[in-house]
Amino acid sequence: MIKWLWKANQPQAEMLAQWREALNIPLLAPLNEEEQQRLVSVASHLLQQKRLVPLQGVVLTPLMQARLTLLFALPVMELGAKWLDGFHEVLIYPSPFVVDDDWQDDAGLVHSGQTVQSGQSWEQGPIVLNWQDIQDSFDLSGFNLVIHEAAHKLDMRNGGHSNGVPPIAMRDVAAWEYDLHQAMDNIQDEIDMVGVDAASMDAYAASDPAECFAVLSEYFFSAPELLENRFPLVYRHFCTFYRQDPLARLKRWENESQNIESSSPMG
């Protein structure tokens, strides 16, 4: 078990200064000062509630702990840490890991064997991650293992199993399901046309609604322009559910960065 090395009851300004290095990753660059403070507040609560369990020689430094928890906190920054109270442990392998798995083929036959996994979210248990892919989740590439697994846990809050529909108002469920399935079909059509490797989005999103929600949540936070361009209705659903607009946040940050550059004296 990892014991958090920083205090959670510090003044916000002091706490933010200690988290500054942890916040310094491309994924979190668009957040303004107020948003960073909210994110750190949620992350601090999560660190008090979760056990980080390093496996197979993984050594978690305070900076690694902080960055991992900030990734968990991002999707619930406006919802609150309580939305991730469905698990108590995070198991961390050094790299993708081998598990015994059962799966069903297109003919309905069930197969058993070993598969390589990047992460898992158990319905009645922990989240399992690997540090190699956690590090690849720090940028704005559209890939984010931590957000993917956190999305599964949010999905499970709606009845205890993941089906692609997190807790939303009943009046919104039909439109959510329709638009999500339309996105799945669109992604599958693209895969059929150009192949998995040339597809513009992760083919895993077309496998089932639960994976579609998790994969598109990755794009929502780390490649919002792509998601909004491809599936604007899904993007708006996600804005309502997560209570965030990452694309607006990204554009604000880009404009501010351009203004700073244009006002800088020529060197």
From Swiss-Prot:
GO terms for cellular component: cytosol. Binds 1 zinc ion per subunit. Gene3D superfamilies: Collagenase (Catalytic Domain), Glucose-regulated metallo-peptidase M90, N-terminal domain. The keyword Transport does not apply. Its EC number is 3.4.11.-. Involved in the modulation of the activity of the glucose-phosphotransferase system (glucose-PTS). Interacts with the transcriptional repressor Mlc, preventing its interaction with DNA and leading to the modulation of expression of genes regulated by Mlc, including ptsG, which encodes the PTS system glucose-specific EIICB component. Interacts with Mlc. This is Mlc titration factor A.
